[in-house]
A protein has these predicted regions:
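Selective for proline/serine-rich intrinsically disordered segments
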Residues: 8-12, 26, 137, 393
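Bacterial N-terminal signal peptides that target proteins for export
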Residues: 2-18
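Basic/polar N-terminal segments that are highly enriched at the extreme N-terminus
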Residues: 1-7, 30-34, 460
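Bacterial N-terminal signal peptides
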Residues: 16-28
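Acidic/polar surface patches and capping/hinge elements
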Residues: 32-460
Length: 460
C-alpha cells in the first residue's frame, strides 16, 4: 500500500508558476477535442450526469457509454478485445457517427420515458442538441448511416447486458444496532435535530461488476480503527475532529485545507475531466505520447470508467459489510469508552456527510481506480494535471451564513500526489477517518489493475 502521510499542517505548495499557468490555460484546448472526448464530457457532466443519481450511478452510466463507444469503433476496425461480441460494421462506417450514436443511444436507453421533470428535460435537451450538432458536421451518405448503425448496435448490446445487473435496487432497508462503532443514519444540518438521511446504496455492493469476478473480490479486512480504544482510532478521531470541523474550516474559508476539502466533489466526478484535460494539453506532459486516435482514446476511457464502476461496487460491498460509523456520529457520541477521545454533541463536518458508512471512502476509491488505469496505460506515475473547479456554496451550522461559491485551482505533478490530496480532502471535509481513505485508494487501485489486465486487451 502506498503511504499517505498524516499532515498536521497544509503541505507546502510550490508555485510551479509555469506549470500552473499551462494547466489552467489548457481548458480552451478542449475546443480541439475529438468526438470521443466531446461525448465523454456530455455524458459525465451536468445536466446529464446528475440526472442519473449519485457517484456510483453516474459511474455505471459512464462505463456503459464508454464500452459502447469502444465496441462501436472496434466493430469498424478491430484493434482490441471487444466487451460485447458485435457483427462487423460496414467498412465505410463513419467513426464519429458511431461514437455519437453509441453515446446517444445508451443515454436514451437509460432514461425512462416517464415521469417528466425539469432535470430530465435538461438532460434530454443536452443529449439531443449535441447529437444533432454532431450529425450536422458529418457528410450525409452511407458512411454516416453505417456509423450510426454501428453505434446503435454497440449501445443495444451493453443495454441488454446490463438490463438486470442489480442497479434497479440500490437501496435496501437498513437495520443496525444503536451501538458504539456502528454506522447510524446521517443527521441533517440546520433542520429538525431528529432529521436523518435514509442510508443509501447498500444494494450497490451486490451489483454485477463489469470486469471483477464478484463484488467481494477486493473486500478489505477490518480496519485498525475498528478498535475504538486503540491508538489508530484515537489518532484518526482527533485528526478529523480538529481538521474537519465546520466551525474551524468556516473560520478559515480561504485556507489551503478548506480549499482542498472543497475542490474534490463526490465520487469520481472530476476524473473524466482530468483525463480529458491531460489529453487536451500535451505540452504539460511532453514525456507522454498523448497523440491518441479515436480507438486509443475510446479504450482508455472505457477502461477507466469500468474500473471506477467496479471499484464503486467493491467499496459499497466493504462499507455495508462492516457498517463502521462516520465521524459525524462518533464525535457526537456521549461516551465511546476511549478516554483519549472527547465528544462534542454540536460538532458538524465541514462538507456534508453522505448517507452511508465510513469504511472505505468512495472518493479515494474512485481516484485509485482512475489513476491506476492511467498509470498502467502510460507506464508512469509522473502525469501532471490541474484545473479550476467551481466549488458550490457550503452551508455552515446556524447562525453562521453559508460560505459562498468559489473558484478553486489545484495542480499536481503526479498521480500519487493527486490521490494523496484526495485522502486529505475527505479528512479536512470531516467526512471520513483517514484509514478508510488511504485503504480506499488501495482498493480502487486493485480494481483498476484487474480491469486493465483483463479487459479490452490489444489483439495479437
Amino acid at each position: 500500500m502506498r503511504s499517505y502521510s498524516r499532515r498536521s499542517e497544509p503541505r507546502p505548495q510550490p508555485l510551479r508558476c509555469a506549470l500552473l499557468v499551462a494547466l489552467v490555460a489548457a481548458a480552451p484546448a478542449l475546443a480541439q477535442a475529438s468526438s470521443v472526448t466531446q461525448w465523454n464530457a456530455i455524458a459525465s457532466t451536468a445536466p446529464v450526469a446528475p440526472f442519473f443519481g449519485g457517484p456510483p450511478q453516474q459511474a455505471r452510466v459512464n462505463a456503459m457509454v464508454q464500452i459502447a463507444v469502444h465496441d462501436a469503433l472496434n466493430s469498424i476496425q478491430p484493434r482490441y478485445e471487444s466487451y460485447d461480441i458485435l457483427p462487423g460494421a460496414a467498412a465505410d462506417a463513419n467513426p464519429d457517427a458511431a461514437v455519437a450514436a453509441a453515446t446517444y443511444s445508451v443515454l436514451h436507453g437509460l432514461i425512462d420515458p416517464k415521469p417528466d421533470s425539469p432535470a430530465k428535460t435538461a438532460a434530454l435537451d443536452a443529449i439531443n442538441n449535441a447529437y444533432a450538432a454532431a450529425l450536422a458536421d458529418i457528410p450525409d451518405g452511407n458512411g454516416e448511416v453505417h456509423g450510426i448503425a454501428a453505434g446503435a448496435a454497440a449501445a443495444n448490446a451493453i443495454l441488454a447486458r446490463r438490463a438486470n445487473d442489480g442497479s434497479a435496487t440500490p437501496n435496501l432497508p437498513y437495520a443496525a444496532p444503536v451501538a458504539i462503532g456502528v454506522y447510524q443514519p446521517t443527521p441533517v444540518m440546520n433542520t429538525d435535530p431528529q432529521a436523518y438521511i435514509v442510508p443509501a446504496n447498500e444494494g450497490w455492493g451486490l451489483m454485477q461488476p463489469f470486469v471483477m469476478r464478484s463484488p467481494s473480490q477486493f473486500r478489505f479486512a477490518p480496519g485498525k480503527l475498528f478498535d475504538i480504544k486503540g491508538q489508530a482510532y484515537t489518532r484518526d478521531y482527533n485528526e478529523v475532529k480538529a481538521k474537519g470541523d465546520a466551525l474551524v474550516r468556516g473560520a478559515m474559508p480561504d485556507s489551503e485545507e478548506s480549499d482542498i476539502a472543497r475542490f474534490w466533489p463526490g465520487g469520481g466526478a472530476n476524473w473524466n475531466r482530468v483525463l480529458r484535460e491531460i489529453l487536451a494539453a500535451p505540452a504539460n506532459n511532453p514525456q507522454l505520447d498523448l497523440d491518441l486516435d479515436l480507438w486509443q482514446q475510446a479504450r482508455l476511457f472505457a477502461l477507466a470508467n469500468m474500473a471506477e464502476s467496479d471499484a464503486a461496487i467493491a467499496v459499497f460491498d466493504t462499507k455495508y459489510t462492516y457498517r463502521f460509523w462516520r465521524p459525524i456520529t462518533a464525535i457526537r457520541w456521549q461516551d465511546d469508552g476511549n478516554p483519549a477521545t472527547a465528544p462534542d454533541a454540536n460538532w458538524w463536518s465541514f462538507m456534508a456527510t453522505p448517507p452511508y458508512p465510513d469504511y472505505l471512502c468512495g472518493l479515494t476509491n474512485a481516484s485509485g481506480a482512475h489513476t491506476e488505469v492511467l498509470r498502467r496505460y502510460f507506464r508512469t506515475d509522473d502525469i501532471a494535471w490541474g484545473f479550476t473547479f467551481n466549488a458550490p456554496s457550503v452551508p455552515l451550522p446556524a447562525p453562521l451564513l453559508p460560505l459562498p461559491a468559489k473558484s478553486i485551482t489545484r495542480s499536481f505533478v503526479s498521480l500519487d500526489e493527486a490521490t494523496a490530496e484526495a485522502v486529505d480532502a475527505r479528512v479536512f471535509g470531516g467526512m471520513h477517518f483517514r484509514e478508510g481513505c488511504t485503504k480506499g485508494v488501495t482498493q480502487g487501485e486493485q480494481a483498476g489493475r484487474f480491469v486493465f489486465q483483463h479487459a479490452l486487451r490489444p489483439l495479437r
